[in-house]
Amino acid sequence: MKMRIAALAIGALFAVLTGATAWAADKDAAPPPVSTDPQTTSASYGDWILNCVRSQDGSSRVCEIVQTFQIQGQQGPFARLAIGHVGAKDPLRATFDVAPNISFPSTVKLALDDKDTQPVELTWKKCVPGAGCFADAELKEDVLKRWKAQTGNGRITMKDSTGHDVAVPFSFRGLPQALDGLAKS
């Protein structure tokens, strides 16, 4: 019994000393300098927000335009539609992420309205606990041209976990200006 208590005491002392050494090393390390350029920026264009984030070393920026969706009476968004480039030379992609309440196999459709015969189909890529389920697709130039000409609401459709179709309206208001801002970023 005494050996067990001694072993526990030695283990506790080791943990304290190890933690103190790590804390001292962290305390002595200088934080990186702060850039004169902002690390993150955002600009609103109607119902769309252009978000840009600078890399840690300041050598590049990643930007996307976003529209979030919130259920009345609930805190925080339940879904998000984002448009951006994965890499600087890559084509524009639309990404939809939503809380995990979906059916497989299924797709997400982005349409001008309920009569649109050429909706953009986004393929589910992954579901991440605590983050949501993600679907995406490349946006072709003809689709962007049609979307820029719209003034009302589009329609996002998907299947929920019970297999029922769910429709969520999204806004085209400010999309042309947001896409122009994205192109300049």
Predicted regions and their residues:
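Bacterial N-terminal signal peptides that target proteins for export
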Residues: 1-10
